Structure formats: structure tokens, C-alpha cells
Amino acid sequence: MSHEPEYKDWQQIVELIRSSVDNQQHEMLLTMLMTPDERESLTARVNILNELLKGELSQRQISQMLGVGIATITRGSNELKSKSDTDKDKLKTLLEQGAQ
């Protein structure tokens, strides 16, 4: 008998998270899925994207402010460059709403 994982692709994970939000269990789910270091890294990534989208600081300044390496900022910048202006605007709006 062969066993296969139930969750095989990213969309299934997104749907799992969406379902956890609908059931108000997202904090529990994300806390159980991610180690403290992973949660810290995710927080840094959100801040990197937020600062890059604001465009007020250089990559070096963002690196110093967040205590992460320039390469980490560059990866975030490269990911943003691969997205459409529409997607960047949507992300910027989400980040602004989340910070309130």
C-alpha cells in the first residue's frame, strides 16, 4: 500500500489558511505550522516588502533597520520586480490595511 501526502501543492495550503481564517483559527494554525524563527523571518519579509513598496528608504537602510542582510532585501526586491503593477498595488493596500 502506497501512501501519499494529502497536501500536494501550494493552492491546497492557501485554501487551508483561508479556511482557518473563516473559522477564526488562523493564529493557531500558523503558530503550529511555523517555528518561532520562521515566524520572525516572515515578519521580516512583510516589513521588507512594505518598506520597498513605500520607496522611502534605500535597501541598505532597510537592511540596517530590520537587522537583515542585503541579500535578503535583494531577494524581496527581485520578487517584487517580477510582479505586475496591479499586484504590487494590491499588496501595498493590504499592507497598509494590516498596519492599522
Curated annotation (Swiss-Prot):
Main location: cytoplasm
A Pfam match: Trp_repressor
GO molecular function: DNA-binding transcription factor activity; sequence-specific DNA binding
Keywords associated with the record: Cytoplasm, DNA-binding, Repressor, Transcription, Transcription regulation
Region (Disordered): 78-100
Segments of the chain annotated as binding DNA: 59-82
Ranges annotated as biased composition (Basic and acidic residues): 78-93
GO biological process: negative regulation of DNA-templated transcription
The keyword DNA-binding is assigned to this record: yes
Disulfide-linked positions: none
Superkingdom of the source species: Bacteria
Gene Ontology CC: cytoplasm
Localization annotation: Cytoplasm
Self-association state and partner proteins as the record states: Homodimer.
Function: This protein is an aporepressor. When complexed with L-tryptophan it binds the operator region of the trp operon and prevents the initiation of transcription.
Family: Belongs to the TrpR family.
Protein name (Swiss-Prot/TrEMBL): Trp operon repressor homolog
Lineage of origin: Bacteria, Pseudomonadati, Pseudomonadota, Gammaproteobacteria, Vibrionales
Gene: trpR
